[in-house]
Every structure is written in structure tokens, then in C-alpha cells.
Swiss-Prot record:
Signal peptide: none
Protein known as: Chromosome segregation in meiosis protein 3
Keywords: Cell cycle, DNA damage, DNA repair, DNA replication inhibitor, Meiosis, Nucleus
Originating organism: Candida glabrata (strain ATCC 2001 / BCRC 20586 / JCM 3761 / NBRC 0622 / NRRL Y-65 / CBS 138) (Yeast)
Keyword Zinc-finger: no
Length: 309
């Protein structure tokens, strides 16, 4: 082994020193800060502490929301002996202790704000709230609530060909049959259902106005046997009074009622008779030659004389 080989292996070489850099401001010599342990590639960096954050995994852990669901019904109780303020203070204290154990870095107000924003954005927390809601609904309405929500096809009825309109010639008849079947299903269950308002079966005064009118022969028979007046199909009619003897007659000569034109004619005739009667009364007063107001004037003069006027 010669002298060159010894130099290549580093035997007898001088130890390395920090690189000295000439400072342009002071004019002195400064060491290079980027070199650590004589390694120019090493960088001096500080190790940061891990930042603890409030995440969905922390809220769904055993010390998170499951802890509240388990212990809140027992520890958060409202006492009638305490005031409303004391009861509310007792509830808030429970949640403050729970928040401090779960995430002690944040204050209670900041913890509530973080939980609110995280619950709106995280899908796992939304699913957890949905499961809690369904469990509560099952406790109130039974186990069938979840099965109905999970299998909505059980409640929906398949659409058949009879429910769809057809373009054939018999489409109207088929639609009418479907409507009739639907009406029968609806009316068939009215006896077992409870109505919000009681139905007055006896008060059928207005039902005669809306139901179909029987033929004229039956109307004539009813008018002859009773005092009730049926409503005809065409014109608006009124019962016959003593002042209006005219009316619409049936084929057998029975008077049913007067039409609208006959009513107007009867009113006009009555007005004419009244005017004629007044004219005749005035004519009788003129024939006697005595003014109707003269007797009253004479009585007034006699009364004034008695009083001394």
C-alpha cells in the first residue's frame, strides 16, 4: 500500500471544519448555519407538537355522543322543587363536564360551535342522527316504522293497465268502471271510519234542492196528497198563493206552480189593481165635495177656541 492509497482512505488527513463565510456587512468571518455536523445537506427544523382536532371519530367514540345518550337520561333530571334557572344550570353543567373531558382544549362556547359545523358537513354524524331519530320513532310507533321506511315498495301499489287511459273506443267505459270501483271502496269503509264532524242524517232540508226531481206525474200526485211543493226541473217556480191563482198545469190539469213570467204578470196585475183602487177612492172623495183635510182643520179650530186663542 503506497502513500496515495493511504490518502484515498483518509488516513492521516486533517479533520473537516465548518465552512467559513465572509460577512459582507461586518467584514468578518461567519459560519454557515445550514451545515449541521459538517453535513451541507442537513436542515435545522423544529418538530411541531401534534394539533388535536375535534373530528367525527372523536364525537362517535365511546366518550362522545354515545356517552351522552347513555348517561344523560339519568343525570339530567328536572326537579319540580328547583326553579327553572336551577334546572337549566344543572343541564348545562352536565354538558360542560362532558365537553371538557372530550375536548379540553376548547371552551364550551367554541365546542358547541365546532360540533354544530361538524354535524352539518360530516356524513357519519348525519347518519348517526338519522339512526337516533328512527330508533325514537320505533319506540313511539312500533317496529313497523323502520320496515316501512326501508321497504317503501311494500306500501306502493303497482300501476295496472286498468288505471291508465286508453285511446280505444271503450276507454270511457273502462275509466268509468275504475271510478265506480274506487267509489265503492271509499264508500264501503265509511261505517268503520271516524269522522271529525258528526253527520246530521235527520237534517235533510237542503237535500231536496240538490237531488234529482221525479217526473211531473209524481209531482202532481204529491201536490194533491200533501202540502209540500217539489222543485221542477226547468224554470224556477214558487208555490201558488191566493193572490196568484195562475200557474203551470200538468197534463191532467193539476196546478204545479207558476213560472217566472207568470209571476211578473201577476205582480203587474196586482199593482194595476191597487192603482185603480186608489183612483176610485180619490174619486169618491171628490164626489162628496168634502176635502179629507177639512174635518181635521175644523177639529183644530174648535180646540183653539176652547183654549182661548
Amino acid at each position: 500500500m503506497d502513500e496515495d492509497d493511504m490518502l484515498m482512505l483518509g488516513v492521516g488527513a486533517e479533520p473537516t471544519q465548518h465552512a467559513e463565510i465572509e460577512d459582507p456587512l461586518t467584514g468578518g468571518v461567519a459560519s454557515d448555519p445550514t451545515m449541521i455536523n459538517d453535513d451541507p445537506t442537513a436542515v435545522n427544523a423544529k418538530v411541531r407538537r401534534p394539533q388535536v382536532k375535534l373530528t367525527a371519530e372523536r364525537l362517535l367514540s365511546p366518550n362522545g355522543l354515545p356517552y351522552v345518550m347513555k348517561h344523560a337520561p339519568k343525570r339530567v333530571r328536572i326537579s319540580k322543587s328547583r326553579s327553572t334557572y336551577k334546572n337549566l344550570e344543572h343541564i348545562i353543567q352536565f354538558y360542560q363536564l362532558w365537553a371538557h373531558e372530550l375536548f379540553p382544549k376548547a371552551k364550551f362556547k367554541d365546542f358547541v360551535r365546532l360540533c354544530n359545523s361538524l354535524g352539518k358537513t360530516d356524513a357519519d354524524l348525519r347518519n348517526y342522527r338519522t339512526e337516533l331519530f328512527r330508533a325514537d320513532m320505533e319506540n313511539q310507533f312500533g317496529d313497523g316504522y323502520r320496515s316501512d321506511k326501508q321497504n317503501p315498495a311494500n306500501n306502493s301499489q303497482p300501476v295496472t293497465s286498468t288505471q291508465l287511459p286508453n285511446n280505444d273506443a271503450n276507454s270511457n267505459d273502462e275509466n268509468n268502471n275504475v271510478e265506480n270501483d274506487t267509489n265503492q271502496l271509499i264508500t264501503g269503509g265509511q261505517e268503520t271510519t271516524r269522522h271529525l264532524f258528526a253527520r246530521d242524517e235527520e237534517d235533510d232540508d237542503d237535500s231536496d234542492l240538490y237531488r234529482s226531481v221525479p217526473p211531473p206525474s209524481s209531482i202532481a200526485h204529491e201536490s194533491a196528497t200533501s202540502n209540500t211543493h217539489a222543485v221542477p226541473t226547468s224554470d224556477t217556480t214558487l208555490p201558488i198563493s191566493d193572490n196568484n191563482p195562475k200557474g203551470v198545469t200538468n197534463s191532467d190539469g193539476t196546478v204545479i206552480g207558476i213560472s217566472e213570467e207568470d209571476e211578473l204578470l201577476a205582480m203587474e196585475e196586482e199593482l194595476n189593481n191597487y192603482a185603480t183602487q186608489k183612483i176610485e177612492e180619490l174619486g169618491d172623495d171628490k164626489d162628496t165635495g168634502i176635502d179629507p183635510g177639512e174635518e181635521e182643520d175644523e177639529d183644530a179650530l174648535d180646540a183653539m177656541k176652547e183654549l182661548g186663542f
